[in-house]
Amino acid sequence: AADLAEDFGIAARSELFRSVIVHFENDRPVQLEERHVLPKLAPDYLTVDFGRTTPYDYLSKVAPIEEVEHVLRAVMPEERTRKLLAMKGEEPCLLMIRRTWARGQIASIARLCYPGSRYEMSGRFRP
């Protein structure tokens, strides 16, 4: 918890909201989203129906995004993650850690875990 407060740049033991959501596609789990949110930027976060909207969409409306940071890592998932994502054996995950800024401060930090066999990342950029 102290590390998380430090990541947000707030005092240790400050309140943070937390949500854990498993996202499905064609009845298969494809993402485990664990998100922490700064309450003063999204005070109604814990009352939102995330069956109707995503945390990202909600946060984009109440605390418009100014900056986003992505960190990608290949990791071996913990047992809990493996079960929630219906993963087999020693399959690795792609872990994306996303920090989002709004109103000059970090609004949320999300840990997004994707089963290695069910996720592909691609991009196309122009210089």
Features from the language model and the residues they span:
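C-terminal all-alpha effector/ligand-binding and dimerization domain
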Residues: 1-127
